[in-house]
């Protein structure tokens, strides 16, 4: 039976409490780490295109200020509620700690269906929401820095930064009040694909660990692995893209209208264009339509990537999931009951709280760019290329051998912004994966990777509180 009265925040608290038993921190400090520090629930009027006034419900939660600013996305959805926003803000604290990004956790949401509003109405709602955050000091480059989430994107972030700058004239670092902006407005190249690429880097690192893969009965590496992706949004699309490009076989993709299966693999860009033309992923050439979109979750595969919304795998359907590895690209796609099932089955769950940290990691890079007021690579790209050219020319003169044009182009290339962003993200995800695995392997009592990830996060936040002291 599907769990009734599901609370996402309670689910996060359960995972926290489970991990806290494996740490040395006193009870009072653990309660502070777990608590949401500030919850701003708001309602404000907006005049719609037809002249009527609609009262909009919104939230911004700051889970922790052990490091500032707070960081977390803003989602537009009719499913937005205080419980969800609190849970997501909590996960942001733990996520940032795990990947060594110096932010506290935050999250925001507006309870609307963005598809039911015109562009002008969405702009007014976004700008009014931003002004409410400014009034209560809930936004700013050193206070709380939002980002895109479900139902929002670059457009909304541009509206936010413009509103903030209008209300805070002369603030030199104002571009850092929000991330996920268009590149022309201070955004960073590589942000769009960051979460999906981070998912790939994290799972690839796990797949490269021989001892882990041996326990699962799988060969090392991602090449040839059967992958199922739930969701063809930004995260699902890019997860599928990077797995396919690195030799995996994406056999199924699901969306809200249905799911498809193709034994020899699905090209995500071709499917995206098919959906754009027809309005659906169904009837994709060469693929089989599945009866229900949830059927994709239960297909035989090596890696399952839920990249949609939370609570899609629960105590009811978890026993039928056949994947050996589940990579939580979405926030909270598994309930605690599902976790218990997978622990008993020996399925490896790579947890959301670090696996989808690519977005906040690259948001951190964007924030740093905004504070430094210079594009990554601008100062060193040409210097590096000239130096590499000189070294290569010297080697050719000394050896009497010439490299091919393709090799020369590769060797002489100086890193530009997207190269540096991708490299920084790869380093971040590899380091985080290894830290979590080291904690898990060091204590055989820790039951799963999620608990090990929470232990990692709790220890880092606890250390911060201890070193800074409790004021006053």
Name these PLM-found stretches.
Residues 2-7, 206-207, 320, 324-472:
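Adenosine-phosphate binding glycine-rich loop
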Residues 7, 11-14, 80-83, 117-128, ...:
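Conserved active-site and cofactor/substrate-binding residues in soluble primary-metabolism enzymes
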Residues 77, 97-223, 468:
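Glycine/serine-rich phosphate-binding loop and adjoining beta1-alpha1 elements at the start
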Residues 186-300:
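Glycine-rich phosphate/diphosphate-binding loop of Rossmann-like nucleotide-binding domains
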Residues 2-43:
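Short, Gly/Pro- and small/polar-rich lid/capping loops
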Residues 258-349, 354:
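Rossmann-like adenosine-cofactor binding region
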Residues 42-114:
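Glycine-rich, N-terminal phosphate-binding loop and its surrounding beta-alpha-beta segment
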């Amino acid at each position: 039976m599907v769990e009734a009265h599901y609370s996402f925040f309670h689910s996060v608290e359960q995972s926290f409490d489970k991990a806290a038993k494996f740490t040395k921190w006193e009870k009072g400090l653990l309660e502070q780490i777990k608590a949401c520090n500030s919850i701003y629930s708001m309602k404000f009027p907006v005049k719609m295109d037809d002249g009527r006034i609609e009262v909009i419900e919104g939230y911004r939660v700051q889970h922790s200020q052990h490091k500032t600013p707070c960081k977390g996305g803003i989602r537009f959805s009719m499913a937005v509620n205080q419980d969800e926003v609190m849970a997501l803000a909590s996960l942001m604290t733990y996520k940032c700690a795990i990947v060594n990004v110096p932010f506290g956790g935050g999250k925001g949401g507006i309870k609307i269906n963005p598809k039911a509003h015109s562009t002008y109405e969405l702009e007014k709602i976004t700008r009014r929401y931003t002004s409410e955050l400014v009034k209560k000091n809930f936004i700013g480059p050193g206070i709380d820095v939002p980002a895109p989430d479900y139902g929002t994107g670059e457009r909304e972030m541009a509206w936010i930064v413009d509103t903030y700058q209008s209300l805070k004239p002369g603030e030199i670092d104002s571009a850092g009040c929000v991330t996920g902006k268009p590149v022309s407005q201070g955004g960073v190249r590589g942000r769009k694909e960051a979460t999906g690429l981070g998912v790939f880097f994290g799972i690839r690192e796990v797949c490269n660990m021989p001892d882990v893969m041996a326990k699962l009965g799988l060969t090392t590496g991602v090449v040839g692995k059967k992958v199922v992706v739930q969701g063809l949004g930004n995260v699902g699309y890019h997860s599928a893209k990077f797995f396919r490009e690195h030799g995996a076989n994406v056999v199924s993709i699901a969306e809200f209208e249905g799911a498809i299966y193709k034994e020899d693999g699905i090209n995500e860009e071709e499917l995206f264009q098919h959906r754009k033309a027809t309005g659906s992923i169904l009837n994709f050439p060469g693929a089989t339509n599945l009866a229900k979109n949830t059927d994709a979750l239960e297909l035989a595969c090596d890696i399952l990537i839920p990249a949609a919304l939370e609570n899609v795998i629960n105590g009811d359907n978890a026993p039928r999931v056949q994947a050996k590895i589940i990579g939580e690209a979405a926030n909270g796609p598994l309930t605690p009951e599902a976790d218990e099932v997978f622990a008993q089955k020996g399925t490896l769950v790579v947890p959301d709280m670090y696996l989808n940290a690519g977005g906040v990691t690259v948001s951190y890079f964007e924030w740093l760019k905004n504070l430094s007021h210079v594009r990554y690579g601008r100062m060193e790209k040409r210097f590096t290329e000239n130096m590499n050219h000189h070294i290569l020319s010297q080697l050719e003169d000394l050896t009497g051998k010439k490299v091919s044009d393709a090799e020369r182009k590769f060797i002489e290339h100086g890193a530009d912004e997207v190269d540096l962003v991708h490299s920084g993200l790869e380093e971040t995800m590899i380091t985080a994966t290894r830290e979590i695995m080291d904690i898990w392997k060091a204590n055989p009592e820790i039951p799963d990777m999620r608990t090990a990830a929470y232990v990692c996060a709790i220890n880092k936040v606890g250390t911060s509180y201890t070193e800074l002291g409790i004021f006053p």
